[in-house]
Amino acid sequence: MSQSRAPAREPSETPSQREQIRSHMKMVIQQLEGILKELKDVAHELREVVGQIDKLTSDLELDLDADDWTVATASSTSSSERGLCEAFRLDFLGQDSLSDSWDFCSFLESSSRRSARDDTKPPPTTASVYSQMNGGLPVPNGPLIITPDSSSEEASSSTHSQSQKTSRTAGTRERVRFSDKILYHALCCDDDEDEDEDEDGRDEEEDKLDTDSERSPLAGSPVPPLPELYNCREPPAGGSHTIPRKDALNPGCRKKLLRNSSTQTVSDKSTQTLLPYVPAKHRNKDL
């Protein structure tokens, strides 16, 4: 029992230790009292300095408005009776500061609305861009999703039909797509050496047809004969009175037709008429 109660017993403090603690507390209290006295002396000196400043600045006349006061002016004009809190107090709830903050908030809201409108606008499509480039008018030959081959006959036929369907307004120019063959024959000269050799035999047949047409009773009509168009078609199998097929054309005559179509102007192709090609030899004979 004595061994279990032994650790519970605490050694009683000696009177010497208590006296040491009391002496330490008295020393701390004395130091705090000395600090308070020093602070009072500093405050008294500051008041004296402020009084001297007021005496020196009493001759100066400073007309300051309440709106122009700042922290520096408030501290310089403060007297000894005013405390530090009154000198450095800022009026954050004034009317001017509230109005400025309200204007700034409204500016932020307007800018956010403008940015939201810009984000909601869809990007311009290619059709609208091409219409703006043409002065707001629709472009007949604009970007197409599916375009035929440039060397095929579908390209030339489709572009020609589109140019006839669309009405051309004044002051606009249409873009016409030429096939590779038309461009080649448009850049080359009309009378090629290779074609002249092939056309020698055909010229004789055309002369015979011209003489036959002169003997006919319709020779005096104003419509000129078109032997070359009939000669371009293949000879019919059923006879001379059968109607020739539309697609039965010789390759040489097809080149002539393409070459004649290339002589039309690019600006207004829809108003031009298709004229037959007459070689230079026949022109000299007619003259």
UniProtKB/Swiss-Prot annotation:
Pfam families: DUF4589. The keyword Ion transport does not apply. GO terms for cellular component: postsynaptic density. Residues 25-58 form a coiled coil. Residues 153-167 have a biased composition (Low complexity). The keyword Coiled coil applies. InterPro entries: Largen/INSYN1. Residues 189-209 have a biased composition (Acidic residues). GO terms for biological process: inhibitory postsynaptic potential. Residues 1-22, 113-174, 189-287 are annotated as: Disordered. It comes from the Eukaryota. It is found in: Postsynaptic density. Keywords: Coiled coil, Synapse. Residues 259-274 have a biased composition (Polar residues). May be a component of the protein machinery at the inhibitory synapses, probably acting as a scaffold. Belongs to the INSYN1 family. This is Inhibitory synaptic factor 1. It comes from Danio rerio. The lineage of its organism: Eukaryota, Metazoa, Chordata, Craniata, Vertebrata. The gene is insy1.
